[in-house]
Amino acid sequence: MKLISASLRRFSLAVLTILLVVSSFAVFTPSASAETYQVKLGTDKGLLAFEPKKLTIKPGDTIEWVNNKVPPHNVVFDPAKNPSKNADLAKSLSHKKLLMSAGQKETTTFAADAPAGDYTFYCEPHRGAGMVGTITVQG
């Protein structure tokens, strides 16, 4: 009987030790933190373009749009050119209000469950001049 009791105690101690070690990995594993990226509206050289024009992000990341040169600018996501072709999603990501002064900022955060793929955006006043860009959300 003492042998069974001692074996049971050792087994319980081993199980508790394993649980403690495994749970410590969950506590000390760094979580993937969201990043913030900056996109300039108008290049430093005064061109009507986004800088950078193409950007790859992960769900949960944020884009900070900074009015740089040759205003006014805004950021509109094309409802026909996002992975889900969802007009409400495009509207929620867009900032249609014109930024008139250099240094003005807006932010767009892609939800943690944002569909992976390419999202096309443009500046309404300068779309005809080619002020268009792409955000690629990784899956």
UniProtKB/Swiss-Prot annotation:
Subcellular location as annotated: Cellular thylakoid membrane
Entry's Gene Ontology cellular component terms: plasma membrane-derived thylakoid membrane
Binding site for Cu cation: H73, C123, H126, M131
InterPro entries: BlueCu_1 (IPR000923), BlueCu_1_BS (IPR028871), Copper_blue_Plastocyanin (IPR001235), Cupredoxin (IPR008972), Plastocyanin (IPR002387), Plastocyanin_cyanobac (IPR023511)
Membrane topology label: Peripheral membrane protein
GO-annotated molecular function: copper ion binding; electron transfer activity
Keyword presence, Transmembrane helix: no
Keyword Electron transport: yes
Cofactor(s) the protein needs: Cu(2+)
Keywords: Copper, Electron transport, Membrane, Metal-binding, Signal, Thylakoid, Transport
SUPFAM superfamilies: Cupredoxins
Pfam families linked to this entry: Copper-bind
Range of residues in the leader sequence: 1-34
Gene3D superfamilies named in the record: Cupredoxins - blue copper proteins (2.60.40.420)
Entry's family note: Belongs to the plastocyanin family.
HAMAP family cross-referenced by the UniProt entry: Cytb6_f_plastocyanin (MF_00566)
Described function: Participates in electron transfer between P700 and the cytochrome b6-f complex in photosystem I.
Protein name: Plastocyanin
Lineage: Bacteria, Bacillati, Cyanobacteriota, Cyanophyceae, Nostocales
